[in-house]
Amino acid sequence: MNNQIWMMTSAFKSLELGKIVEKAKEADVQGLELCVFSNEGSRKDHVATHLDYENFTSDCAKRLLEWFGSEGLRFSVGSYENLIGGNTADRELNQNHLLKLIRIAYLCGGDENDVKVGTFVGYNDELGIQDGGFEKNLYEYRRIFAPIVKYAEDLGVTIIYENCPMEGWRSRTWSFTYNNLPATLAARKLMYALIPSKAHGETYDPSHDVWQHINPSDVVRATDHSRLHRVHVKATRNLRNQSSIYWGAIYPKQYVNEELAQRAGVPVPQHDWDRYPYEAMLPGFGGYDSMDWREFLETLMEIGFDHPFVIENEATNSAHTGNQGATMQGFKTAVWCLAPILWTLKENEGYTFCDNRPKLKISERKDIPVVTMKELLA
């Protein structure tokens, strides 16, 4: 294969970008997915902001491209929020922020430099609880995203959706946990049918399907391969614990009055993300997870996937410890778990990435004004 392996910068919330570049070189990766969340957003978990999105100019783009090119690194940008649901103010802020990231990607060369924009879609629960709520969310998605995708297409930029259901985005008292429209393959195919443009695609994270007892290799085979631009590397270990015995592993653990639960001897969720019996891991770090990574990678080889693998470190025993040493150990282990399948075995060097990538094109694009959803929908 010879795919690039990248790191996602969400694990380094407190570090400046220069320090993260040093970490990337230390881990022997070839690129970074730069998290560029809004500083005004309501989401607080797994967020980071590693570019000045409010003051990003064509000169900033040129300096960033020259810097990363000199370091042998590539990059994309991403922010993962609810763009079709939640309260109106947050929704509008998130939509406008995504438009800022599309502009940044354009200034950095967009598809010419493989600078994609990672995002969620989110979910509108007010529509979702109605009869036909899923289909209503599809049409709300089309209403909001059709002009966004057209804007990206006109600028030569591709938007890519990640498939996390965001099961912890609602209170633990909420009965269902589907909070991000592209969480299933069926939803993604329906989305592309509604907006046929090639200016949007997906980042596939197999860990979310693993805890739903779906084989990610089957999903990859059924995916429109032209839409698959990134793979997030994150692992899941399905747990056989008291929670799975009492609640099963398909439906979310439900919350009831804790005094009643204690009398009945029934476990209830302790926080919003405590809904399913699994543990977040990284491949090869701290034991086995519940996916056959070799089968998964070989399936991607079969379909000719030649895009980056991006390590997203949310592992309980790595980034979630808050220990920078453990965080880097997790990243490095994941790299070397993937390397024997992805990279070439060189004499006396071991498994090595063969860097035959074209150089980053230093963009000479002129600044364009920031646009808003109100302007796109006018």
Name the predicted role of every residue range.
Residues 1-9, 13-28, 69, 88, ...:
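Histidine-acidic metal/acid-base catalytic patches
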Residues 3, 29-30, 34-143, 147-158, ...:
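Structural motif corresponding to the early beta-alpha repeats
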Residues 9-11, 35-36, 79, 163:
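Residue-level recognition of beta-strand->loop/alpha-helix junctions
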Residues 82-83, 163-165, 199, 208:
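Asparagine-centered polar/low-complexity signal
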Residues 121-134, 160-179, 319-320:
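Active-site-proximal beta-alpha loop/turn segments in soluble metabolic enzymes
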Residues 138-139, 149, 168, 187-189:
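Eukaryote-skewed repeat-based solenoidal scaffolds used as protein-protein interaction platforms
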Residues 158-160, 203:
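Conserved Rossmann-fold SDR core element
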